[in-house]
Structures are given as C-alpha cells and as structure tokens.
Amino acid sequence: MNIHKIKYLAVLSMILDHMSSVLFAPDTIGYIILKLIGRIAAPAMCFALAQGFIHTLDRKKYFLRLIIFAVISQIPYAYYMSGSIWFPTGNMLFTLACSFLLLEVVEHHKCLGILSIPITISILYITTFTDWFIFGPLFTLSFYINKENKDLQALSHACISFLSLGYSAYVCMQQGLSWYSQVWQIGVILIIPITYLYNGKLGNKSDFNKWFFYLFYPLHLLVIGIIRSRL
C-alpha cells in the first residue's frame, strides 16, 4: 500500500466520521461504528505527514501549503463544528503544521541544542488549541522516529493511543459524562495494520494526488456542515 492509498483511506474514514452525527443519533450502534472507523483518519494523516517530511523535495513549500490550507479550512471547520464562522480550536491542518515543525526540531536538535526543549514545549502547547490536542504531533513523531522499525512504530502508537483514550475519558468525566462515553476513540489503533502494509512508495505523482486532499478537507467540512444545519 503506497502513501496515496493511505491518504485516500484517511479521506474515506474522515467522511464516515464526520457523517456519523448526520446519519445517526449519538451513542447508537451506527454512530459508534462510524466514529470507530473514522478514528483512522487522524493517525493516517499523521503517518502520511511523517512520510511526506522524509520524502519531499521542498520542505518549505510543503509547510507553506499546510499553513495556507489550514487558514482556508478554518471557517469551514468552524461551521462544521459549531454552525458559525467561529470555533475556539484550529483545524487538523494546523495540527499537521505544528507536527511538521516538531519534526524539524527533531531533525535539527543538535544545532538547536538546549533550545530544542522550549521550542518543543511551545509547539505542543500550541496544539492544545487545535484539533487532536497534543496527540496529533505525538502520533507523527512516533511514526517518524521509528520509521525504520514497524514493530516499534506499532508499539509506540499503541501507547500514545491509550494515552489519548485516557485523556478522552478524563474530559468526559469532567463534563459529567461516563468515562466510556467516547470509547470509540480507541479506533486510532486501527492504523497499525495499515502501517505494516505500507510499501515505502509514494504512488502516482500526479497533480490530482498532490492537491486533492488539500481541496477535499475544507470542501467536505463545508458540505457536511450545511447538510447538518438543514436537518
């Protein structure tokens, strides 16, 4: 399985995740199943980013694309999340941009020296205001630093996945809900068998494959947000 196929898998799971609240009432079997499958999207995007960071010919352009489309996607994201043009957290592309910066810090930690510590803390702090909290960067980092060992990738991802599940349980209890209200969050571990299927290849280097995800992300949020607002 090449990286483009993993991206399209992320697209499919993202659609299922975001359509769950349109098609089903919360806590129904259908809703839980779609949310569980939909959890593949974020770690799949993080995995693709880690591989993109390794293989891209121009990291500056890669980062610039992430930032530009993160800004473009923010209003569609806010509309999907709240039905208005404002939402207090940044969308997933901001999370990926922060993850990209974190990989840069790891790559240049010898040059940065002791500065790499406050920079890393600052990046992780920023992601507390974006989608997927600090877990997006941690997923990405685990995929990157263990890129030569799929078993370590799987183990580290599983550990971070259970940390994210624990955090989700804590948030649920803080909101007066049962700790298991979002147990479907454990679906993030479903990326593990997919990482074993990855063949190290990019896939077809067409402009369509290059730009599809960047365009799909804001458009699908806007469309689903409109559909949900009219139900």
Model-derived segments and their meaning:
Residues 1-231:
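Alpha-helical transmembrane segments and their immediate juxtamembrane cytosolic regions
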